Amino acid sequence: MNTNKILETIKMIEEEKLDIRTITMGISLLDCIDPDGEKARIKIYDKITKSAEHLVEVGRQIESEFGIPIVNKRVSVTPISIIAGATNEESYVKFAQTLDKAADTLGIDFLGGFSALVQKGCTKGDKILINSIPEALAITQKVCASVNVGCTKSGINMNAVRDMGEIIKKTAELTKDKKGFGCAKLVVFANAVEDNPFMAGAFHGVGEAEKIINVGVSGPGVVKRALEKVRGQSFDVVAETIKKTAFKVTRMGELVANEASRRLGVPFGIVDLSLAPTPAVGDSVAEILEEIGLETVGTHGTIAALAMLNDAVKKGGVMACSHVGGLSGAFIPVSEDAGMIEAVIKGSLNLEKLEGMTCVCSVGLDMIAIPGNTPASTISAMIADEAAIGVINNKTTAVRIIPAPGCSVGDMVEFGGLLGRAPVMKVNENSSELFAQRGGRIPAPIHSFKN
């Protein structure tokens, strides 16, 4: 062990806000399927609480022994539309309540997997789950929902895209006392991954093991501090600096993942290489882009800087860890990033620029507040645009958007905690109604046929 390396890591944690964003245990619920909904829910509760009973305790032990902050302990489960589909129930809200109760019992921060995978079409269970989302998110505290509406191999399910615009509006309406907060726990995906440790989009894929440990790291502050030391130097040096820094951050993630795996007796899955910001100053992806040379994020050059950042993070992370996965890249959630918030307030960052940025980074339009009177068809069209970016570029994209009831452009919506605050952003007011109402499927792109 090199003493300088140890001191450097301590400095990264104490001064540069390096932390483990989440330890997420994935749990398969396939053995909980039962035609009797009540029995299924008992099995689900018992399986989750038994499997993850030591998750929070082990997380705290590792935090204390290694001195590494672990911000969240989470659980993801098999998409509930698959589990509940065996029942004859007309609503899956009770399943969401069971998940919430299990999360409370465990003392975890979030539980993901109130999900449906409908990229090619909907089963009966998928339709019921999607229709249950608004009420489920309104009456639970820790449950997160996600719906996958497209993938490169199948194209985009435009019926589901149309429906999700309505669902997001209903969710906002049912949680209007919290400015539409329910929508912060709902993600619409294209090319969703099965091993994502981050919320609100985590679910435990059917191709995964019985139980698995996935870890998400966070280190925008560390990358920014490293780049401050190479100001004025070429992009070659910038890329190399980011790569080396990402290596160090990911090494720490792998250490925690392996230790959690060993103590819990659960296999290690992946480390997600994503740079996840927080609302704290100095823990911002936007500030990294500005350190690269932009006056404010959103100006010309933003997409190129973000593309390089994303690629360099992956190159460094892949070298540091034998199993990487999840979303892996740079997150650009507006409400969770102090630099992004500032850029929106200044007027240098708009929705269209954010859309362009999603072409080259991890996810999509994330934690963006829009006026509460935005039509459902416009939200559906936003989802379609993001899904198209993901499907054509063979990458994960997503929409987590909050139509804040009673709010208009320029208002500030406060969510608190890691979710931060979001300035309400202007949306193109021209109608997409006829587009959204067409339905059907947008076919898979020609380059998806690889067999």
From Swiss-Prot:
Pfam families listed in its UniProt record: DUF711
InterPro entries to which the protein is assigned, alphabetical: UPF0210
Top-level taxon: Bacteria
Family the entry assigns: Belongs to the UPF0210 family.
Subunit structure: Homodimer.
Protein name in the entry: UPF0210 protein CLL_A1718
Source species: Clostridium botulinum (strain Eklund 17B / Type B)
Lineage: Bacteria, Bacillati, Bacillota, Clostridia, Eubacteriales
